[in-house]
């Protein structure tokens, strides 16, 4: 399924996206913000691409003006620890995303997430959307807040804290 915004087409990953995806992950700061290892070989990036490609709701964000892959967005079953998940209705989804560095801070991800929120709202198929971010990732926190997500707590994976944002639909 494709989603359209004013400037983007959100479509499933395809093999033609692999090289641009790997190139996009070369940025160390993007990897830090997303939680990827600081050092990421091309083979590991290819493995991540293939893993994401198996999910039917991994979207490539394609800029309409030139057909360039500018990032990705995953829309997967809610991935939250039980102590948070049990306080929410069943059937929520988690959004995870990255905008490649040359295209950040231009509103593209806001458009993409808004399209996914609207699609789920219209379909009435999920009760909530979840997004998580690291405490140092203030741009993601501002993005979620601006889209109507509210702070819902935090959890840890190993020794890493994730702040959780929820948007009830």
Located regions from the model:
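Acyl-donor (CoA/ACP) binding surface of acyl/acetyltransferases
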Residues: 1-29, 58, 62-169
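Soluble sensory domains of the PAS superfamily and closely related sensory modules
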Residues: 52-54
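Conserved GNAT-fold acetyl-CoA-binding loop/helix
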Residues: 31-50
């Amino acid at each position: 399924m494709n989603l359209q915004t004013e400037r983007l087409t959100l479509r499933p990953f395809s093999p033609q996206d692999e090289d641009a995806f790997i190139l996009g992950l070369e940025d160390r700061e993007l990897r830090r913000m997303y939680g990827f290892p600081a050092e990421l070989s091309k083979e590991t990036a290819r493995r991540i691409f293939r893993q994401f490609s198996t999910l039917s709701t991994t979207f490539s964000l394609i800029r309409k003006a030139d057909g360039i892959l500018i990032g990705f967005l995953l829309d997967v079953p809610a991935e939250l620890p039980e102590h948070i998940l049990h306080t929410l209705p069943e059937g929520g989804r988690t959004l995870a995303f990255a905008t490649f560095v040359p295209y950040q801070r231009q509103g593209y991800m806001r458009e993409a997430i808004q399209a996914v929120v609207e699609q789920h709202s219209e379909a009435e198929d999920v009760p909530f959307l979840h997004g998580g971010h690291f405490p140092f990732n203030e741009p993601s926190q501002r993005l979620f807040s601006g889209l109507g997500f509210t702070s819902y707590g935090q959890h840890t994976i190993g020794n890493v804290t994730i702040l959780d944002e929820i948007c009830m639909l």
